[in-house]
UniProtKB/Swiss-Prot annotation:
It comes from Bradyrhizobium sp. (strain ORS 278). Keywords: DNA recombination, DNA-binding, Transcription, Transcription regulation, Translation regulation. Residues 96-119 are annotated as: Disordered. Heterodimer of an alpha and a beta chain. PANTHER family: DNA-BINDING PROTEIN HU (PTHR33175), INTEGRATION HOST FACTOR SUBUNIT ALPHA (PTHR33175:SF2). This protein is one of the two subunits of integration host factor, a specific DNA-binding protein that functions in genetic recombination as well as in transcriptional and translational control. This is Integration host factor subunit alpha. SUPFAM superfamilies: IHF-like DNA-binding proteins.
Length: 119
């Protein structure tokens, strides 16, 4: 799934759980649906969902403001609403930029304290 540029769907997530965890396809589907429902329910209640090493989903309240119709330039009131925000963790940011958590690029080996320098 990684690096292909495709959109990952619920079906893809269920298949990954099936392949990697070993649950049946029915159990894998139920598991994915349960996790997504729990995240959704928490967000509906206004709770922050923090997934370690991944990121945080939170609901933010936006007050009423004045917007502008781009075609006519007419001012239009935009009603107050709640919006969902995702803030990726530092670890996720590093991974999508090809770095490991220690700041090294993926594929680089960490320096060994036992390596001998030759001169």
């Amino acid at each position: 799934m990684a690096g292909t540029g495709k959109t990952v769907t619920r079906v893809d997530l269920c298949e990954a759980v099936y392949q990697k965890v070993g649950l049946s396809r029915t159990e894998s589907s139920a598991f994915v649906e349960l996790v997504l429902k729990e995240i959704t329910d928490c967000l509906e209640r206004g709770e922050t969902v923090k997934l370690s090493s991944f990121g945080s989903f939170m609901v933010r309240k936006k007050g009423q403001r004045i917007g502008r119709n781009p075609k006519t330039g007419t001012e239009v009131p935009i009603s107050p609403r709640r919006v969902m925000v995702f803030k990726p963790s530092a670890i996720l940011k590093q991974r999508i930029n090809g770095q490991q958590a220690n700041g090294k690029m993926n594929g680089e080996s960490a320096p060994s304290e036992f390596s001998a320098e030759t001169e």
